[in-house]
């Protein structure tokens, strides 16, 4: 045993730098050790492949408590990792080297900061909590992700993709400030508030958190959001989501799906996005998912959401569906069984007009993979600048129809991208992917640890086959543009699986990586905050 049931961090940590901090008069953060009854719940995230055994789990509820936790760990030479929502796809939080986990789930406030004239969000707040609070209190939103329990700490620092991105951009496009606990060369932990103000001397720290990923620069303790150029009352400072949306979901049975049908479906989806991803068009508010499930699931599906208040919205949605599925001989039917992250939604085979918040809850809360306590998974990603080449489609079909592998929760999900996202220059934020039209998520979910090898191999085989012409990964070229940092994939580090001339950091960050390294050198010169794909110090 590592000690008492509960311990508390001692005082005496040095707090300095950045704006003055209010004196912390609260009690010290709770610390769990391995003899705590709650310990098992705090050493694992959503992916049960990764279970840690840290000496301590610290549960701060304020920035000063985070400063103290970081300072004590640094002073004692302990390896730190940080958790906000527990959705990291790799072992970057829970691994054998981690000795202290700083769990931010207790820092979950969402509100309006009158001094900064901006909305604030703490890192432990979840996507659904943030979306509901902003909308119910002020009628606004940020274009954050879909899965309800994802923590904002990592979601935002990785870019913050969401269902409204084609209309409003990425969440980081509305980020105006961030508070981060950093550790300088003097080994002192400090809370720094960095803003997007052009003359802010710490602006590089803000920029690093607009897509540089979590766990590289420090511990985020607060984000502030305000739409660029906005002024006025709080209800005018962030985008307003549509009052109502159309939600339409169909399934196509694999039993009726020939290879030409599959080719037409995937090709049409890509071609539609090539023609309809410029911002300012009539389809800005359309978001779709094309879920290409393994044939053992029995179906593929197309899910579409669109602003129902627009003139002719239902007709536009129906035209989209017709253009994607029109050349497919398989007869569309209701989606009456789950597909990975998507619950059955047979009631939406006919497009339903429903309130936006209700639709957001439906798509997020019903995710079966987030409620299975035994769920394990593996994931890969890609951005597409153009539609799917025939060689990619052929490789997808080969692996989705393999009979030597069976998993109804294995699939590739193509999601709409572009629109407002692509109006931002690649260097304006740390998120470089600003001319793509589709984002791909390769995924497999399973529960039996004995199936780890089979699932990981199947996903690797498919990914390697799809991108065989470019070294097994989606390098930045005229068709593909690298990978999404929030869909972490440690295989990109390995020369066995990445045979291209593009290292993992180039796939994630493109030309922005040297600038991220400079921010790393300034704000984490001792490399305190690190993991398998954290930003490296210059020269390393």
Where are these regions (language model features)?
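C-terminal segment of N-terminal export signals and the immediately downstream linker at the start
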Residues: 13-36
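Loop/turn elements at helix/coil->beta-strand transitions in domains of secreted/extracellular proteins
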Residues: 27-29, 53, 75-80, 97-99, ...
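Short, structural beta-strand-to-alpha-helix junction motif
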Residues: 117-118, 125-135, 149-152, 338, ...
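N-terminal export signals
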Residues: 1-19
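Glycine-/small-residue-rich beta-strand-loop submotif within the FAD-binding core of flavoenzymes
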Residues: 94-122, 163, 167-168, 225-227, ...
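Cofactor-binding catalytic cores of oxidoreductases
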Residues: 29-46, 85, 90-93, 235-540
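FAD-binding subdomain of flavoenzyme oxidoreductases
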Residues: 144, 149-255
């Amino acid at each position: 045993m590592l000690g008492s049931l509960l311990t508390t961090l001692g005082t005496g940590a040095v707090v300095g730098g950045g704006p003055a901090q209010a004196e912390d008069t609260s009690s010290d953060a709770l610390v769990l050790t391995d003899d705590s009854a709650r310990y098992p719940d705090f050493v694992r995230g959503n992916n049960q492949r990764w279970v840690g055994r840290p000496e301590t789990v610290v549960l701060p509820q304020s920035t000063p408590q985070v400063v103290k936790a970081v300072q004590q760990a640094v002073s004692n030479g302990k390896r730190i990792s940080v958790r906000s929502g527990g959705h990291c796809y790799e072992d970057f939080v829970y691994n054998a080297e981690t000795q202290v986990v700083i769990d931010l789930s207790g820092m979950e406030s969402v509100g309006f900061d009158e001094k900064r004239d901006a909305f604030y969000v703490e890192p432990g707040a979840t996507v659904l909590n943030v979306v509901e609070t902003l909308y119910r209190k002020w009628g606004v939103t940020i274009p954050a992700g879909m899965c309800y329990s994802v923590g904002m700490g990592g979601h935002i620092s990785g870019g913050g993709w969401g269902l409204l991105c084609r209309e409003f951009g990425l969440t980081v496009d509305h980020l105006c400030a961030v508070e981060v606990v950093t550790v300088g060369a003097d080994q002192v932990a400090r809370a720094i508030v960095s803003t997007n103000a052009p003359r802010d001397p710490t602006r590089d720290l803000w920029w690093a958190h607009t897509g540089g990923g979590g766990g590289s620069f420090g511990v985020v303790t607060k984000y502030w959001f305000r739409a660029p150029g906005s002024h006025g009352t709080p209800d005018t400072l962030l985008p307003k989501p549509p009052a109502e949306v159309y939600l339409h979901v169909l399934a196509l049975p694999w039993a009726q799906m020939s290879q030409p049908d599959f080719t037409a479906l995937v090709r049409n989806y890509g071609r539609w996005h090539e023609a309809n991803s410029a911002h300012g068009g009539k389809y800005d508010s359309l978001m779709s998912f094309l879920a290409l499930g393994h044939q053992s699931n029995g179906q593929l599906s197309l899910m579409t959401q669109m602003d129902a208040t627009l003139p002719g919205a239902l007709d536009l949605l129906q035209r989209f569906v017709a253009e994607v599925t029109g050349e497919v001989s398989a007869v569309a039917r209701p989606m009456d069984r789950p597909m990975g992250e998507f619950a059955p939604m047979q009631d939406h085979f006919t497009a339903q007009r429903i309130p936006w918040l209700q639709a957001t809850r439906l798509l997020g809360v019903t995710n079966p993979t987030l409620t299975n306590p035994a769920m394990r998974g593996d994931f890969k990603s890609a951005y597409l600048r153009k539609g799917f080449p025939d060689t990619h489609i052929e490789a997808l079909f080969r692996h989705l129809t393999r009979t030597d592998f069976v998993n109804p929760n294995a699939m590739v999900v193509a999601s709409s991208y572009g629109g407002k996202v692509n109006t931002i220059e690649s260097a304006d934020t740390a998120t470089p992917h600003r001319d793509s039209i589709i984002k791909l998520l390769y995924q497999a979910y399973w529960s039996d640890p004995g199936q780890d090898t089979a699932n990981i191999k199947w996903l690797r085989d498919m990914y390697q086959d799809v991108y065989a012409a470019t070294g097994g990964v989606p390098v930045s070229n005229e068709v593909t543009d690298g990978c999404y940092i929030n869909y972490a994939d440690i295989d990109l580090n390995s020369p066995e699986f990445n045979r291209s001339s593009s290292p993992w950091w180039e796939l994630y960050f493109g030309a922005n990586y040297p600038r991220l390294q400079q921010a790393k050198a300034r704000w984490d010169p001792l490399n305190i905050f690190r993991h398998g794909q954290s930003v490296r110090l210059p020269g390393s």
